[in-house]
């Protein structure tokens, strides 16, 4: 059988080539792939939140609470560990979400928008303003002993919903605005993680910290000894999670720490992969007809696949593997478990009304004011410069989009409020403000943004990320 491919034709079957070509192009643009997944995830999050709200306010509302409080546990001899299904989602599955967040932060610091000070200045200023102003506004409106603990709720931006809104605006949104929003959200997440670790954790138990340190050191040691199998890291990662939990710190912090220490450098690199793959494939090409056995072919393909695997950093590989599961599995389940707020016809009491109003105001008013004001101040003081293709119109849309604070805001609300009525009020404020912010962002985007790009603007998100024009 001839192995010669006519000029201009693919060696792959026609029916397989087109989708594989699209897949390879998408895989070759990691940031665009990330934003595609986030946009689709935002739609799924909206559906999950709507289902939760309808379920919690339907004739079957009791089944909603009963379902999420279903006890789950393990028993080994005299040892019993039992928690509710809601706890499994919020403290267990969300640790994987925070693990991916930790890796994304590390990647951005290593090679993304946060890798250079002059590139990171604008999103850092925007994120800082977008955290401080909402928190300050919340405390201004809800500075009582019962309500002030919720100051951290309106601080974070939900990247999935925010990217989904920008996607609905289509070609009006310049790629540089998407990249700036992503960098802002990454710093927002980092700020929220610090807030959770410092302000929303109970008293620290030293024994638990020692167990957590043992797990983290185990992960680090395995990395240093070159352990490649992802499955091998499950045991030390679980030890770290259990230690952080028993220490009185929220266990999702363990996911963040392990994500931050996941290597972002490749073992082989692009050049090494090209050299290795070319060498292996040349051996096949030089074989005489009948000399190439299926065993030799499979061994060659195995080595090429190993080279492909080693050409990707562990962080990049894990993000590519876990991000779809987090975006389309864990986050919608979290929304389903936490967005079911009973809406009563009875008026809220004073404390609940204060929490709902302060939370909604912090997100809907404080976020845009903080983001836009901090950007203006940083530009005025020449601490940062705008990316090519962006102006104040785009920053107005950025600020309004940043007011969508769904996943992280609901998560912090779970930690901030111990009283059921205050937790429900906080969630109600988050849902109302996020919905209103989404509408405002869409209206402003349609009004302020045009389909014609500014001179010098990047044409894709990866080109915008690579640009050093900041």
UniProtKB/Swiss-Prot annotation:
Lineage from the top down? Bacteria, Pseudomonadati, Myxococcota, Myxococcia, Myxococcales
User: What do the Gene Ontology cellular component annotations say?
Assistant: plasma membrane
Transmembrane region positions? 34-54, 85-105, 121-141, 150-170, 179-199, 202-222, 241-261, 317-337, 357-377, 395-415, 423-443
UniProt keywords (A-Z) are: Antiport, Cell inner membrane, Cell membrane, Ion transport, Membrane, Sodium, Sodium transport, Transmembrane, Transmembrane helix, Transport
Q: Which GO terms describe its biological process?
A: regulation of pH
Pfam families from the UniProt entry:
Na_H_antiport_1
Gene symbol here is nhaA2
What this protein catalyses is:
Na(+)(in) + 2 H(+)(out) = Na(+)(out) + 2 H(+)(in)
Role: Na(+)/H(+) antiporter that extrudes sodium in exchange for external protons.
For this entry, the protein name equals: Na(+)/H(+) antiporter NhaA 2
Q: GO MF annotations for this entry?
A: sodium:proton antiporter activity
Which HAMAP family does the protein's record reference? NhaA
Q: Which family does it belong to?
A: Belongs to the NhaA Na(+)/H(+) (TC 2.A.33) antiporter family.
Report the locations given in the UniProt record.
Answer: Cell inner membrane
Per the record's keyword annotation, is Repeat included, yes or no? no
Which organism was this protein described from? Myxococcus xanthus (strain DK1622)
Does the record carry 4Fe-4S as a key word?
Answer: no
- Entry-linked Gene3D superfamilies: Na+/H+ antiporter like domain
Annotated membrane topology is: Multi-pass membrane protein
């Amino acid at each position: 059988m001839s192995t010669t491919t006519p000029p201009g034709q693919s060696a792959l079957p026609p029916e397989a080539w087109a989708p594989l070509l699209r897949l390879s192009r998408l895989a070759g643009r990691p940031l665009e792939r990330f934003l595609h997944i986030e946009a689709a995830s935002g739609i799924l999050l909206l559906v999950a939140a709507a289902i939760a709200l309808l379920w919690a306010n339907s004739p079957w509302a009791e089944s909603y609470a009963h379902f999420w409080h279903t006890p789950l546990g393990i028993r080994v001899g005299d040892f019993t560990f039992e928690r509710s299904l809601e706890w499994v989602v919020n403290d267990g599955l969300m640790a994987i979400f925070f693990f991916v967040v930790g890796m994304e932060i590390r990647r951005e610091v290593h090679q993304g928008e946060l890798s250079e000070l002059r590139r990171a200045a604008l999103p850092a200023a925007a994120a800082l303003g977008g955290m401080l102003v909402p928190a300050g506004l919340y405390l201004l409106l809800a500075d009582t002993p019962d309500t002030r603990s919720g100051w951290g709720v309106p601080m974070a931006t939900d990247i999935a919903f925010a990217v989904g809104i920008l996607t609905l605006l289509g070609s009006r949104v310049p790629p540089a605005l998407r990249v700036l929003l992503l960098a802002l959200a990454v710093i927002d997440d980092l700020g929220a993680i610090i807030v959770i670790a410092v302000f929303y954790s109970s008293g620290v138990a030293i024994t638990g910290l020692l167990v957590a340190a043992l797990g983290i050191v185990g992960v680090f040691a395995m990395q240093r000894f070159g352990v490649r199998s992802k499955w091998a890291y499950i045991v030390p990662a679980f030890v770290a999670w259990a230690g952080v939990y028993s220490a009185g710190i929220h266990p999702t912090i363990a996911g963040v720490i392990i994500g931050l220490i996941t290597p972002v450098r490749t073992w082989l690199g692009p050049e090494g992969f090209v050299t290795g793959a070319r060498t292996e494939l040349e051996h096949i090409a030089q074989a005489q007809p009948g000399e190439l056995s299926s065993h030799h072919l499979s061994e060659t393909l195995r080595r090429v696949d190993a080279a492909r695997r080693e050409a990707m950093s562990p962080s990049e590989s894990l993000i590519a593997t876990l991000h779809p599961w987090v975006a389309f599995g864990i986050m919608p389940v979290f929304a389903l478990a936490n967005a079911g707020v009973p809406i009563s016809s009875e008026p809220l009491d004073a404390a609940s009304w204060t929490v709902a109003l302060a939370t909604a105001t912090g997100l809907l008013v404080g976020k845009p004011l903080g983001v836009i004001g901090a950007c203006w101040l940083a530009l005025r003081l020449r601490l940062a410069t705008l990316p090519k293709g962006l102006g104040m119109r785009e920053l107005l849309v950025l600020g309004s989009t940043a007011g969508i604070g769904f996943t992280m805001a609901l998560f912090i609300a779970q930690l901030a409020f111990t009283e059921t009525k205050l937790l429900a009020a906080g969630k109600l404020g988050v849902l109302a403000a996020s919905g209103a912010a989404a509408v405002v962002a869409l209206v402003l985007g349609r009004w302020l943004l045009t389909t014609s790009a500014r001179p010098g603007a990047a044409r894709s998100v990866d080109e915008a990320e690579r640009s050093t024009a900041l």
